Amino acid sequence: MPTDHKFNELSSGHGFLESPRYHDGKLFLSDFFNTRVIVMDPRDGSWEKIADVPNSPSGLGFLSDGSMLIVSQHDHKLLRRAADGTTTVHADLAPFCGGDANDMRVVDGHAYVGNFGFDLAGGAETQTTRLIHVTPNGEVSAVPGDVLFPNGVELHPDGKTLLLSETLGHKISAYDRQPDGTLTNYRTWAELPETHNPDGMTVDSDGGVWYANVFIEGPESGFYRVEEGGRITDRILVPDAWGVAVTFGGPDNDVLYLITNATTLPDFAQGRSAGYVRTANVGRRGAN
């Protein structure tokens, strides 16, 4: 049986939260339904808005100059927010998006962006798509390999393996990341139970993946740790909401920030959700 861990509540009263990023001692998050990016003080949960994104923000990441990249979901844009708050279009993702643009990870200036692949809220038929690669100068391409709802992205501690949540594929996939940022050798890293829909994820220093189990409430809702090959070792059950995203942070990089949203697919389609930030200590440190 997996080891169970408890959680504490840090903040509530949000819409649909996504893409937590711990950066410079603060927690940055997207709020889909309130169309804003916020920054939170992880000590007490207080927060403020730092950007309006009318077409709904999703994935977040940072460049070496301190500017922030923001995925704008509905119009398939990758935005760049400078330190002074000025926002410009970094890349147009539209030619490569099926459905909304989604979560993202930035590694050495390269952005890897997921997309739904189809109109989820509209009830369209499920379709495969491709992970999107955006170079530091804004060039966009589709990564080889058909994937099913590419979502959370993370770099393995080995520095050369990029991991991907395939939400409706019920698995964690992997690519080899080349020195120029391109991805090759798409493969399955861990098969998950059919009731697990991995969303946002993070990696600990031992190489285990912590992922959120989305689109489900009840006994299996929450967060899980899986090792390469599919062995689940730990879990944090959150039966009152979807598990959506997770990241390590804190002064010692040993606090898990858990993003949960109380909603259902019909409510999600109508823009209704109650978002929470929760925390857990699991005896491990983040890799990144």
Describe each model-derived feature in a short phrase.
Residues 1-15, 45, 186-187, 280-283:
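A short helix->beta-strand "capping" segment at the edge of beta-propeller domains
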Residues 1-5, 25, 34, 40, ...:
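Blade/loop signatures of beta-propeller domains
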Residues 36-38, 77-79, 129-132, 171-173, ...:
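A short loop-to-beta-strand structural motif that recurs across blades of beta-propeller domains
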Residues 247-288:
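Blade-level signature of beta-propeller repeat domains, shared across WD40, Kelch, NHL, RCC1
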